[in-house]
């Protein structure tokens, strides 16, 4: 075969296609291990859990506020309990609040783990969904890096940005020990719950109404974030 024929064969030889795990939009940068699959599976579980809880929202809102606070750790539960405590109708409220803090952070370790396993990969997956998502993530990441571990205490700011998601992932990226992350996360959540409790104590029913309206939006944003990450990764894996 002449050199000219060899050149023609090389020109027509298709380049080897990248492996499925190396496709754009996957959180990992190498062939996934069992840990990667487990972490991705936990993301799927969180999404399913969040969707399953939606029909229970009306039931939860109808519970005695301290019980709702202990079961969910929600802002509404904390504020409602504060309103009751101000008139002496919520004994042992601190115990309910502390239990609620533990319940509220039960899945946060998954985001820390994703950051430890995949680094910015998990942020890039979410940023690819839209220009707005990419802009919001970049904005949060910028100030979160400057704050370092103190960013955990701003993770629960009630604004429609993926603050907790980005901050928790960054804590995993920076190799913060899991025990330290969970302790700081628990303290942060407890302080914020005490803040909502105080608002309920001082203001009463109006602050509860405002938090209810915010929760309607925030819950859907949080669930949508997890579902998009899980479904996007699974669809690309099948390809």
Predicted regions: what they are:
Residues 162-166, 186-194:
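Hydrophobic alpha-helical transmembrane bundles that constitute the permease/transmembrane domains
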Residues 90-99, 132, 173-190:
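Membrane-interface alpha-helices at helix entry/exit sites of multi-pass transporters
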Residues 79-83, 224-230:
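Hydrophobic cores of alpha-helical transmembrane segments in multi-pass inner/ER membrane proteins
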Residues 1-64, 88-160, 204-221, 232-239:
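Membrane-interfacial helix-loop-helix
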Residues 194-206:
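Transmembrane alpha-helical segments of integral membrane proteins
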Residues 56-91, 159-170:
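Transmembrane helix boundary and interhelical junction motifs in multipass membrane proteins
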Residues 70-72, 104-105, 186:
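Hydrophobic transmembrane-helix microenvironments that flank and shape a buried ionizable site
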């Amino acid at each position: 075969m002449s050199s000219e024929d060899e050149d023609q064969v090389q020109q027509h030889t298709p380049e080897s296609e990248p492996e499925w795990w190396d496709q754009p939009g996957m959180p990992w940068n190498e062939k996934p291990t069992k840990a990667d699959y487990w972490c991705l599976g936990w993301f799927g579980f969180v999404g399913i859990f969040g969707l399953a809880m939606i029909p229970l929202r009306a039931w939860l809102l109808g519970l005695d506020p301290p019980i709702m606070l202990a079961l969910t750790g929600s802002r509404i539960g904390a504020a409602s309990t504060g309103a009751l405590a101000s008139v002496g109708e919520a004994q042992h409220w601190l115990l309910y609040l502390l239990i609620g803090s533990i319940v509220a952070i039960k899945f946060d370790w998954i985001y820390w783990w994703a950051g430890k396993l995949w680094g910015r990969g998990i942020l890039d997956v979410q940023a690819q969904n839209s220009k707005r998502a990419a802009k919001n993530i970049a904005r949060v990441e910028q100030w979160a890096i400057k704050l370092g571990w103190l960013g955990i205490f701003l993770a629960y700011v009630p604004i429609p940005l993926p603050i907790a998601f980005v901050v928790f992932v960054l804590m995993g990226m920076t190799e913060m020990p899991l025990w330290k992350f969970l302790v700081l996360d628990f303290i942060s959540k407890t302080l914020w719950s005490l803040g909502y409790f105080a608002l309920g104590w001082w203001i009463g029913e109006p602050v509860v109404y405002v938090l209810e309206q915010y929760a309607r939006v925030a819950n859907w944003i949080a669930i949508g974030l997890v579902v998009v990450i899980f479904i996007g990764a699974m669809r690309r894996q099948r390809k």
